[in-house]
Amino acid sequence: MAINNQRIRIRLKAFDHKLIDISTQEIVDTAKKTGAQVKGPIPLPVRKEKFTILISPHVNKKARDQYEIRTHKRLIDIVEPTDKTVDALMKLDLASGVDVQISLS
């Protein structure tokens, strides 16, 4: 029994691009095995945050370190999901470094 005119939108965020690629592949494989149509994964723009920190505690304004955090994002749409698809996605165990947001529309 298919849920009519519905789709599941899954947004993934991670700092490590390898983890997010593995997780998206697991989600796509699981959805395709249950007979749902998958659109994606769509890579969204990478958010880069840069921080500059003074190394010395008192003087030496020129002594600084720069750090960067990159947040990778992916978007997956599952069109016409079945009940098996929803059950399989709920049972799926993903990596701990991946943030998953699921919305129905």
Swiss-Prot record:
Belongs to the universal ribosomal protein uS10 family. Part of the 30S ribosomal subunit. The gene is rpsJ. Involved in the binding of tRNA to the ribosomes. It comes from Francisella tularensis subsp. holarctica (strain LVS). Keywords: Ribonucleoprotein, Ribosomal protein. GO terms for molecular function: structural constituent of ribosome; tRNA binding. Pfam families: Ribosomal_S10. The lineage of its organism: Bacteria, Pseudomonadati, Pseudomonadota, Gammaproteobacteria, Thiotrichales. The keyword Ribosomal protein applies. Signal peptide: none annotated. PANTHER family: 30S RIBOSOMAL PROTEIN S10 FAMILY MEMBER. GO terms for biological process: translation. This is Small ribosomal subunit protein uS10.
